[in-house]
Amino acid sequence: MEEKNNSKLKLTTLAMAQIAVSAALLCVLSPLAIPLPIPVPFTLQVLVVIMIALILKPSYAIIAQLIYTVLGIVGLPVFSGGKSGFGTILSPTGGFIIGFIIASFFVSLVKEKLKIKNSVLRYILSSVIVGIPCIYIPGIAMYMIFVKTDLLTAIVTLTSVFILIDLAKCVIASLIAVPVNKALAKIK
């Protein structure tokens, strides 16, 4: 009986470690931003968000995203460009932060429900078909509100700049997630 309890404790400890490392990755990599002529900079956030979603269970993925978001809201400079505060959520880039939370949960959920295991192609498809829309829809909506532009202009502006790069990030995240998941399977 004791062995079973230790196993549960190990899983709980592993889950906490995965969540902590994921939140830390977001906090370290998200502030790195390359400014662009539009109010949304180039970052590695999509890559990290998708990678986390492909590695963690849905509940763990969303917890990691929420930790990152709360840390940014309370004042740690973890959002793109080292920004922080609730005002960042209420800005042209705020919808993307909301989208990261949504995407991390749904990409992970699709991976789990469809029993996608260590298939780069299936990881890419799930992250592109589910993750990108989950990120872009609230991102475009908030951009429209705060930049005061119409839907078509917002879509063209944001997708023309980011879509190919974000698709590449989904591929890279998938390539990273497969060996990480294989290694984690050996630990469990």
Question: Where do the model's predicted regions map?
Answer:
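Interfacial aromatic-anchored transmembrane helix boundaries in multi-pass membrane proteins
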Residues: S30-P41, T69-A103
